[in-house]
Amino acid sequence: MAFDIHATPSRVPARLDHRPVKKRIALVALATDHTSERDFARICDPDRVGVYVNRIAYENPTTRETLLKTGPRLTAAAAQILPEEAVDVVAYGCTAASIVLG
């Protein structure tokens, strides 16, 4: 079965929003994390705050050693979130690793 699709080019000039939301949060989450993105979505007003996420590798089980392995990965992961753009906050979605790393 064939379909004919008729399209007309738009005459409305296209432009991207410079910054569609007032505040930006860069969230680094663990690859195994099931909740951080949903938690941020529930507490942040999407018309005012954008949450932009990147994940880092993480191997279960949770031990001091596996938590320490996340440290060297954080800078590169955060840098990949909206590269060349300013963010207002960088959050790391792992309290246990934050404590172990200091």
Please place each PLM-identified region on the residue numbering.
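N-terminal glycine-rich phosphate/adenylate-binding segment common to multiple enzyme folds
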Residues: 70-102
